[in-house]
Swiss-Prot record:
Pfam families: ATP-synt_ab (PF00006), ATP-synt_ab_N (PF02874), ATP-synt_VA_C (PF22919). It is a peripheral membrane protein. The lineage of its organism: Bacteria, Bacillati, Actinomycetota, Actinomycetes, Micrococcales. GO terms for cellular component: plasma membrane; proton-transporting ATP synthase complex. Keywords: ATP synthesis, ATP-binding, Cell membrane, CF(1), Hydrogen ion transport, Ion transport, Membrane, Nucleotide-binding, Translocase, Transport. GO terms for molecular function: ATP binding; ATP hydrolysis activity; proton-transporting ATP synthase activity, rotational mechanism. Coiled coil: none annotated. This is ATP synthase subunit beta. The keyword Ion transport applies. It comes from the Bacteria.
Amino acid sequence: MTDTATAPVASDSVAGVGRIVRVTGPVVDIEFPHDSIPPVYNALKTTITIGEESTEITLEIALHLGDDVVRAIALKPTDGLVRGQEVRDTGAAISVPVGDITKGKVFNVTGDILNNEGGEPIEITERWPIHRKPPMFDQLESKTQLFETGIKVIDLLTPYVQGGKIGLFGGAGVGKTVLIQEMIQRVAQDHGGVSVFAGVGERTREGNDLIMEMEEAGVFDKTALVFGQMDEPPGTRLRVALSALTMAEYFRDVKNQDVLLFIDNIFRFTQAGSEVSTLLGRMPSAVGYQPNLADEMGVLQERITSTRGHSITSLQAIYVPADDYTDPAPATTFAHLDATTELSREIASRGLYPAVDPLTSTSRILDPRYLGQAHYDTATRVKAILQKNKELQEIIAILGVDELSEEDKVTVSRARRIQQFLSQNTYMAKKFTGVEGSTVPLKNTIESFSKIADGDYDHVAEQAFFNVGDLDDVERRWSEIQKENG
């Protein structure tokens, strides 16, 4: 662990005991002796006893109010706390377990293991504090490198950056969970890396479904999961992304592995920050959000990066309130993103998966300086054909295909083949389709789409392009179709 990466942690020698002077929901004011006031971000502990049941709760110091009183945010419900009750300073910030021990485990914000009920006690050898400095400038990887996924539509049209941040938009039922699992599988299989999942404000049911689906798919043991559920206090939902990120940083910095960090949902991180800000009595800014929204987002996002050749690549699900992209919460997130992947319900309804919308998805490295001229030219031509086809759909709906010019008919025909070819048999979808997944090298993807755009495959039926890997699969499927048709 490098000293540049670790936030300062208070010494045990100054740890003291304070007493609660006020409780307002999840906000607790505590008075400490004058000579042992703990610093901001220190974790405090106290015990709530109701009947015969005792529960230890953790609080995090957010403000110093003066007169030896600190204001803390509770990370568990405060029902049962009373004035005068003792609170113990732990002498350090919240810390979480790190290392291989985290794989195949489900954690809460403070690093307690949630899926070891009745099992053998697990010995945790190392913990890292969740408040850490981003890597120093001279530690950053200066190269902008493509993160190759082997998924054609992503690699060609919305390429991901190694160590970048990708925004993932998608409603229910469009294949978002399958895409998450697919990326986890591919990081483990093709990049020798691990995945960390942060459930920020997750519905408990959704989190449970995700765990069961990951176990079925065989990717659970390659993943660490950290949950701050929807029913938990805002302090928990605000910090859970930092807990997950800390685990990811260990794999990057100590294990020298590439990591995929999935955050669902980054909007709920902002929402939790807004709730905490209001509870602390800060004056709200635009649309009621916290005044330090940009700073809070920056603290999280600046730690997601590449260092010394190893990276944390982050896939962040983003909820857009009322589809208003100018809302401060999504607008602040967009400033940090390197690529956006939008999953389309209309494309999913046609059975084309991954249901990525090639025209609304974007990437900052879709540029010949980063990808090379051949990749850029092919991607631009494919997008132009799809855009022209979209414009012609209105004419087709009113007048029919026959009324189009010969040139437009060719464009529509090629666009349909491209749309079919953008679909792909994925490893995670095998249980639905019965078709083995495929990883398509980027070079093959560029050559394949270039040939389709040139018209080299105009003679091949559209159905031969559906849910296949490369052009070899298309030719094989086309031969089978021809045999069936005699």
